[in-house]
Amino acid sequence: MNLDTTTIDSIVAQAEVAIAQASDPTALDQVRVNFLGKKGLFTEQMKGLGKLPKEEKPKMGQVINIAKQAVQKLLTERGELLRAQEIKEKLAAESIDVTLPGRGTQIGGLHPVTRTIARIESFFGDLGFEVKDGPEVEDDYHNFDALNIPEHHPARQDHDTFYFNPKLVLRTQTSGVQIRTMEVEQPPLRIISPGKVYRNDYDQTHTPMFHQVEGLMVDKDVSFTHLKGILHDFLHHFFEEEVEIRFRPSYFPFTEPSAEVDIMGKNGKWLEVLGCGMVHPNVLRSVGIDPEVYTGFAFGMGVERLTMLRYGVNDLRAFFENDLRFLKQFK
């Protein structure tokens, strides 16, 4: 093939036809290789420049470069067109009917027990009570002895308590957290200790594992009046209504005097909701606090019990059966 402008024009014309006939990006790329590649037609023409007279080389080289640029422009334009067509076809194949109804999203919710604990923490947090935590596997000193529960007390018997060995138990209340706090912190103290506790019992109103929140306040001149006022406000806040409340004398080894708190149910009967009392002097002495200087009150409530009363649940075991039909009611 002679190297002249006619030849170059012919190659450009061939390229135009080949580019126009390329139906997809792969075919177009093959056209590029055939004309502009290392072994393409334009490369062969460039090699022929060496055979031309010296004065003709620059002019012919310029002609070839202009032709190559023209072909490259055609390739680029055709490539953009093919890619646009490809995208259009893909969108048409994967089109979305915006008139179809949307798919609902499954939204989770907090477990009712978790909701109750959060509600309790929020109320007492506003009163300056700190949330404290402690071990669920507890030694007998912090679970019993320091709480004025002697070795012969019924609460320490095997049928009520889960023992690992004679000195190690699954805690039966979160009161051990109060002892551990008073061992390392000095009054004034305001704490609550929510957490899991364990007792060997299982029926409609009891499970071997349940949740408890215990509270403690120790300071100078703390009285039973303070305790009654705080618990009275808490119960009205928790149930979001004016509930009738009574304090009934009771006995707990770690408080003196002690009381149980009842509320009037919708059926006209009193329902026990928590226990409380003034911290026993022996408990204060066990942690190095002088009961002649400081006094305090303590209270404890079963979270599941309060949750049952708030939401009208009859069987405590429903909280632990993972039945979504039940749990979805509390979103």
UniProtKB/Swiss-Prot annotation:
Per UniProt, the enzyme's principal EC class comes to ligase
- Tell me, what is one Gene Ontology molecular-function annotation carried by this entry? magnesium ion binding
* UniProt subcellular location: Cytoplasm
Provide the transmembrane region boundaries: none
A biological process (GO) of this protein is: phenylalanyl-tRNA aminoacylation
Cofactor dependence is on: Mg(2+)
Q: What is its main location?
A: cytoplasm
Concerning CDD domains, the annotation shows: PheRS_alpha_core
Q: Which residues bind Mg(2+)?
A: 256
Top-rank lineage group of the source organism: Bacteria
Query: What reaction gets catalysed by this protein?
Result: tRNA(Phe) + L-phenylalanine + ATP = L-phenylalanyl-tRNA(Phe) + AMP + diphosphate + H(+)
What's one Pfam family the UniProt record gives for this protein?
Phe_tRNA-synt_N
Q: Which UniProt keywords apply?
A: Aminoacyl-tRNA synthetase, ATP-binding, Cytoplasm, Ligase, Magnesium, Metal-binding, Nucleotide-binding, Protein biosynthesis
Note accompanying the cofactor annotation: Binds 2 magnesium ions per tetramer.
**Xref: InterPro entries:** aa-tRNA-synth_II, aa-tRNA-synth_II/BPL/LPL, Phe-tRNA-synth_IIc_asu, Phe-tRNA_ligase_II_N, Phe_tRNA_ligase_alpha1_bac, Phenylalanyl-tRNA_Synthase, tRNA-bd_arm
Q: NCBIfam families recorded for this chain?
A: pheS
The family classification in the record reads: Belongs to the class-II aminoacyl-tRNA synthetase family. Phe-tRNA synthetase alpha subunit type 1 subfamily.
Name the UniProt record assigns to this protein: Phenylalanine--tRNA ligase alpha subunit
Q: Which organism is it from?
A: Colwellia psychrerythraea (strain 34H / ATCC BAA-681)
Q: What is the lineage of its organism?
A: Bacteria, Pseudomonadati, Pseudomonadota, Gammaproteobacteria, Alteromonadales
